[in-house]
Amino acid sequence: MDATAFHPSLWGDFFVKYEPPTAPKRGHMTQRAELLKEEVRKTLKAAANQIKNALDLIITLQRLGLDHHYENEISELLRFVYSSSDYDDKDLYVVSLRFYLLRKHGHRVSSDVFMSFKDEEGNFVVDDTKCLLSLYNAAYLMTHGEKVLDEAITFTRRQLEALLLDPLEPALADEVYLTLQTPLFRRLRILEAVNYIPIYGKEAGRNEAILELAKLNFNLAQLIYCEELKEVTLWWKQLNVETNLSFIRDRIVECHFWMTGACCEPRYSLSRVIATKMTALITVLDDMMDTYSTTEEAMLLAEAIYRWEENAAELLPGYMKHFYLYLLKTIDSCGGELGPNRSFRTFYLKEMLKVFVRGSSQEIKWRNENYVPKTISEHLEHSGPTVGAFQVACSSFVGMGDNITKESFEWLLTYPELVKSLMNIARLLNDTASTKREQTAGHHVSTVQCYMLKHGTTMDEACEKIKELTEDSWKDMMELYLTPTEHPKLVAQTIVDFARTADYMYKETDGFTFSHTIKDMIAKLFVDPISLF
């Protein structure tokens, strides 16, 4: 792709000066939110006596982005739900919601519970919209071989699509539309909160304290996000992209949006900042090596990154030198931000960058030799690491707490199967979104083109096959997510969150490269507060 085809930044210096209109009310909002948190906590404790009420409350708190305030209470409640048989197993809504929440929290529950909702011919018998939505969302937490969940998706999708042809209550119509667009488990948690708050506000049975807390919680988080955006924008400006690197994708705000989609809780501010910088640096590396540089220049840059020392800059062409030195300076400064007990983690940032350039070098070799990988598996082995999902997910752990240990970082660098499933999802989604653009731009063959050439299919047929492989990778991820490891559950949860961001960014097109497609959602997340009235 000609570098000039990348559109310029849509945001420029906007966030350097921007403050949301709620900023002067921060103190009052914080005090009010603390009072409401305790009121909602009492409601949560009172729900423990009735499983259906408990499940309804948990899913509401999750969708409104409030569950991180009640992690211990929710975990305790779900342990009770898991061990109790005191619920109506003839109520499909309850059975589906129980299945969804337990699997989402890592409990391995059987999908056989849905067999009783079929008739003698093996067809589902459901006509209630709320039950259809609950079953559809539950079915997307499937692993391989769960035929009943595959059948549930086919059945419920057909029913829900038919429902949209008839008038529905506004809140229910919104729910059906959102669900068909993206099942609940795959939605970005912070965007789900933004979208669900107005829907919940229309529900007759809403809890006013929960609704008010959700609005305050989002507006307070937005203030933190905007502070981070100012910091990373000022950092980015020092690269002087418009003059020195005019050929790259200038997407610092989109990088932060990506990281916020995966790690939205306020306590992960440092994590978001470090991961945003890492994502932006990887974007520069990708555009240099994949789009702009000659093969010789790209190999020189790779060698400099392997060496990781200032004097290696002398080997580089002029346009690379400043970037390379700024890269080294940025990673070193991360060590200072982390403090003495966690500064060792910068070693892993360096290693992740080396993994990226190693994979990019292999892709350049393929392109120059017109080599087509023999199988999709061979392709993914080399192209998975260059999609960047592994690097940005791991870099987010660098800024997290001490529960992410050195052993966890060492484990991540071995490419465990959970990480591979993330890389596969991101690569396959990226390829289906961008293959038509890249096919005409002299890139190495994508997984889509690889399949076309090996099987003699059209591009549309190949894209459908790649979508099937993407779904298989989601099943891989779910199986691995349910498998206990010695590492904190936060690691697996965050990796799943990064798969969700890939799904969002590449669902219809390459939303990162062509970021006008996500501009409105960025504004909803970072610019527009939610009205409290």
Curated annotation (Swiss-Prot):
Location(s) in or outside the cell: Cytoplasm
Cofactor(s) required, per the database record: Mg(2+); Co(2+); Mn(2+)
Gene3D superfamilies (alphabetical): Farnesyl Diphosphate Synthase, Terpene synthase, N-terminal domain
Catalytic reactions of this protein: (2E,6E)-farnesyl diphosphate = (E)-beta-farnesene + diphosphate
Molecular function terms from GO: magnesium ion binding; terpene synthase activity
InterPro entries per the UniProt record, alphabetical: Isoprenoid_synthase_dom_sf, Terpene_cyclase-like_1_C, Terpene_cyclase_plant_C1, Terpene_synth_N, Terpene_synth_N_sf, Terpene_synthase-like, Terpene_synthase_metal-bd, Terpenoid_cyclase/PrenylTrfase
Domain of life assignment: Eukaryota
Family: Belongs to the terpene synthase family.
Name of the protein described by the UniProt record: (E)-beta-farnesene synthase
